[in-house]
């Protein structure tokens, strides 16, 4: 069996490496950075912050896959209190009543691929409630107008990520690097050769799995068709001195922003007496990151009293095309760039043709790519289709 080369050591690359090695393949993984993890890397202490808001969903196949391999680190559940909502220029403890009722009325319905979420939801619960529901999805899309996305695309993560009871979100203690380290250990135990600090400028010999960001894959493969819609958002990572009464989460039902105080569930992420906050605001078309940052800071002003005077550390990031796939009406995950690129080249990542929500897309595409690559390496060509997960 030929050796499989994997380019990229993020969640998709590590999943592909583990899955390929479990099938008996010889695997070599190449990562350009000094550390594995990609966008799942956490910064080192004293402030262990992820690249944008991250959470695992305990109702996901990715969660089950990690658990079956003992790759789930200790994790925290979200607090049951401390959620606030920004609505009509006020910070509230309860959401807009219409939106809450709308969510209950929509439960159990199958959202269509052909319609945008705003049109579909409005036909069942009215325009105002539909708009409020759509704006709650800023954290899931990093998009300035979630309501224009496909109803089928938006409704599933809304139900699973925000409307499930009890909440399905889980937070790895110590940040996402805890997951990355366990996956690295599993790969090494399976005999995967890992080379970090190795930048790839030419496509390696097939079979190869390209598990990079889509823009990097486009350059490496020389294939300009490798594009898809993604989010555009500014993210502020802040450390502030503790103050009693700070909320855990702020859901912005006006401008699709989001604030999360991660130390509410995992105090180890910041030094004692400090809180680690991540806040994000989607950037509107034609808007600068500076203007979006100002809007985000106004949200912080409303929700975290005196945060500017309490600030001890700050990092600003602009995430453009790096937050996963977004599907417009009449498009589904099947229309995204295909995993199988032909001639023993396969693609994995969170913007390719694989089902799931958020990080599940990277995982499911990597599992599919590994099956195809192992079959190619063994000289069997293309295997019969096997569904990685159901949608």
Give the location of each predicted region.
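Mid-domain catalytic core of redox enzymes
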Residues: 23, 198-289, 336, 387-391
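Hydrophobic anchor at the start of a short beta-strand
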Residues: 4, 25-27, 208-211, 309-316
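Conserved Rossmann-like nucleotide-cofactor binding loop
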Residues: 12, 35, 215
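Glycine-rich FAD pyrophosphate-binding loop
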Residues: 21-44
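N-terminal Rossmann-like FAD-binding beta1-loop-alpha1 element of flavoenzymes
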Residues: 2-29
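Dinucleotide-binding Rossmann-like beta1-alpha1 core, especially the glycine-rich loop
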Residues: 45-131, 135-136
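Active-site/ligand-binding neighborhood in enzyme catalytic cores
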Residues: 105-207
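Conserved flavin/dinucleotide-binding core of flavoenzymes
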Residues: 262, 268-391
